[in-house]
Curated annotation (Swiss-Prot):
Job description of the protein: Involved in the synthesis of autoinducer 2 (AI-2) which is secreted by bacteria and is used to communicate both the cell density and the metabolic potential of the environment. The regulation of gene expression in response to changes in cell density is called quorum sensing. Catalyzes the transformation of S-ribosylhomocysteine (RHC) to homocysteine (HC) and 4,5-dihydroxy-2,3-pentadione (DPD).
The species this protein was found in: Helicobacter pylori (strain G27)
Oligomer status and interactors: Homodimer.
Gene this protein is translated from: luxS
Upper classification of the organism: Bacteria, Pseudomonadati, Campylobacterota, Epsilonproteobacteria, Campylobacterales
Listed name of the protein: S-ribosylhomocysteine lyase
Enzyme Commission number, as recorded: 4.4.1.21
């Protein structure tokens, strides 16, 4: 039986056919003034087999959201997937997949050097007690260890 086409791109992705970790273009939108928005699926864990624990995911979200902007001024957003298997990276007017991989690599290397999770306090975060720097570093390290595989989505 064929699955009906959904409005959300990732709901149309056959999650049983991907091989994490990977980085893929999930969507492209052209604005009325010609701006290009590209959303990347940055998958850390194999769907339906593994997931990131919340404190590690939450800390990696904070770290990458802050650090990635040191490497790229076209980043719009870095947000976690509800399934806890990856993140979405949204960029504006930048259409170079190879450079995105390089920026992600540099960012993850910087995560490994971090001494604290940015904005992990009650004034700047909605769940400040839910952080682990070591957990975030472990996720970044595992992702970097598979750097050669990031462009192999498997679909």
């Amino acid at each position: 039986m064929k699955t009906p086409k959904m409005n959300v791109e990732s709901f149309n992705l056959d999650h049983t056919k991907v091989k994490a970790p990977y980085v893929r273009i999930a969507d492209r939108k052209k604005g009325v003034n010609g701006d290009l928005i590209i959303k990347y699926d940055v998958r850390f864990k194999q769907p339906n087999q593994d997931h990131m624990d919340m404190p590690s995911l939450h800390s990696l979200e904070h770290l990458v959201a802050e650090i990635i902007r040191n490497h790229a001024n076209y980043v719009v957003d870095w947000s976690p997937m509800g399934c806890q298997t990856g993140f979405y990276l949204t960029v504006l007017n930048h259409d170079n997949y190879t450079e995105i991989l390089e920026v992600l690599e540099k960012t993850m290397q910087d995560v490994l050097k971090a001494t604290e999770v940015p904005a992990s306090n009650e004034k700047q975060c909605g769940w400040a007690a839910n952080h682990t720097l070591e957990g975030a570093k472990n996720l970044a390290r595992a992702f970097l260890d598979k750097r050669a595989e990031w462009s192999e989505v498997g679909v």
